């Protein structure tokens, strides 16, 4: 009788532990820190930088904005951090990021609640220098020719806690990327 009770207790603990690790999703924030080789100047002499981090819960991200479910933009022209969704119907100042004093590091946090019940998230960084004296006026993101080289989509596992990712990137603008869940 004792063996049966012990077996049932061990089985119950095992099953509840498995269910918890499969279904539990961390609540909190996704932290992102990006390091640059040189000081990032977001506007100079009439030109400005568009710095975009795109997200998708299901698929790999490409340069096509239709593959972005959400994005964060730092618009050097307006000097604002903006949050948007892929159909551009919702676009506004939702978050604030922080630049280091020397302008070589940018960090911010995003609430995981924004990504509904997703267990993974794809992220890709885009970077563009826009000179209004050289290019015609923009008609939206579709007209930008992204200049960030060697960028692959990064898969973030939201079901793993704690999660962290550190990478040294090979592009000529961004030197390092750190991600974490807290």
Give residue ranges: language-model regions:
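Surface-exposed extracytoplasmic segments
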Residues: 18-182
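Sec-dependent bacterial lipoprotein signal peptides
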Residues: 1-18
């Amino acid at each position: 009788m004792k063996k049966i009770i012990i077996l049932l207790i061990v089985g119950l603990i095992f099953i509840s532990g498995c269910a918890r690790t499969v279904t539990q999703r961390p609540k909190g924030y996704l932290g992102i820190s990006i390091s640059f080789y040189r000081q990032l100047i977001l506007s100079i002499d009439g030109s400005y930088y568009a710095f975009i981090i795109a997200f998708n819960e299901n698929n790999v991200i490409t340069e096509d904005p239709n593959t972005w479910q959400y994005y964060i933009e730092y618009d050097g022209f307006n000097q604002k951090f903006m949050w948007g969704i892929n159909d551009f119907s919702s676009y506004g100042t939702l978050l604030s990021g922080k630049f280091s004093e020397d302008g070589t590091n940018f960090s911010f946090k995003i609430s995981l609640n924004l990504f509904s019940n997703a267990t993974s998230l794809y992220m890709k960084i885009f970077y563009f220098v826009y000179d209004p004296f050289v290019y015609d006026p923009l008609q939206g993101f579709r007209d930008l020719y992204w200049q960030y080289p060697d960028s692959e989509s990064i898969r973030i596992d939201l079901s793993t806690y704690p999660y962290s990712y550190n990478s040294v990137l090979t592009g000529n603008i961004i030197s390092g990327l750190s991600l974490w869940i807290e």
